[in-house]
């Protein structure tokens, strides 16, 4: 029976590497998958899933108006799995449509993304995945400044932490760091020694 999975973690926890690994494992067995990502993620181009270690694949971009249920239902083949990167940028209706893909089409959906933003608030997509997912899995990484588990994302501008601003700000290692709770509230500057 198909399930809706939400695999979340702080920045730099290997979410994109994991999604690309899952896609590879299915496809190596001649089991087609559909790889999707938020159309808001433009770091390496719209419709690209790119890891920090250089792995990259094309994906179907999801925009505000995209009906993902209809998109998957209208395919000429039935994929073995739907894989979604940057799912924190999804809207409530996207998450419900992914749940329908699982329940009505019996296709597993694995969604990968951040749980909380740099203000330590839930993203809309993450909020509804936490509510509707059948399985939750935390992908772990360590704090940029110590050895504890990172559960939060710290945003830096010009080497200084920032706690206010628009929720959606696309950036990579240069702007966001995985941190533990202690270093979220009492951060070091990014130039300080670990």
UniProtKB/Swiss-Prot annotation:
Q: Which keywords are on file for this protein?
A: ATP-binding, Cytoplasm, DNA synthesis, Kinase, Metal-binding, Nucleotide-binding, Transferase, Zinc
Q: Which top EC class is named for this enzyme in its record?
A: transferase
Which Pfam families does this entry report, sorted A to Z? TK (PF00265)
GO biological process assignments: DNA biosynthetic process; thymidine metabolic process
What is the E.C. number? Answer: 2.7.1.21
Tell me which residues bind Zn(2+): 143, 146, 180, 183
Subcellular locations according to the entry = Cytoplasm
Which residues are recorded as binding ATP? 9-16, 85-88
The catalytic site is made up of 86
* Any one annotated GO CC term: cytosol
Principal cellular location given in the protein's record? cytoplasm
Query: One MF term from GO for this chain?
Result: thymidine kinase activity
Q: Which InterPro entries match?
A: P-loop_NTPase, Thymidine_kinase, Thymidine_kinase_CS
Q: Which reaction does it catalyse?
A: thymidine + ATP = dTMP + ADP + H(+)
Provide the family line. Answer: Belongs to the thymidine kinase family.
Q: What is the annotated quaternary arrangement, including any partners?
A: Homotetramer.
Q: What is this protein called?
A: Thymidine kinase
What gene is this protein a product of?
tdk
